[in-house]
């Protein structure tokens, strides 16, 4: 498993977790801006929780969210800035039958508006049925 984050602080926490749970033989951590520093390989599954909060919602976030770095939350005007980059690059990193699982929080309307050509499978969670989506490599390949 390759785990990626652009934040050195987030990777420090991840390193502690890897050590605490004895996962060093199964998990490699990479400081990278999305796919930029990943090894050249293809993955069966890519799971991503990018910053997706739109600029209008950023200013209205409850106080407890303000303890999180803005880098971890802010997704640009419509919340889809990094999602666009992920969807564009993911096919190069997904195996032929690979899938992308992407969390977008409460931004489904923005996702649908930004990507009307896509028909993801919306995955149910305990919290909701429209915050986590699955797309195949085939769906992402023009």
What do these predicted regions represent?
Residues 1-59:
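Conserved SAM/SAH cofactor-binding pocket of Class I
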Residues 31, 67, 113:
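Phosphate-coordinating loops and pocket residues in cytosolic domains that bind phosphorylated ligands
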Residues 28-30, 71, 121:
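Structural signal for short hydrophobic segments within the conserved structured cores
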Residues 139-142:
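Flexible, glycine-/basic-rich loop-and-beta segments that form/coincide
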Residues 51-81:
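Mobile active-site "lid"/loop adjacent to the S-adenosyl-L-methionine
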Residues 77-137:
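Conserved Class I SAM-dependent methyltransferase catalytic core
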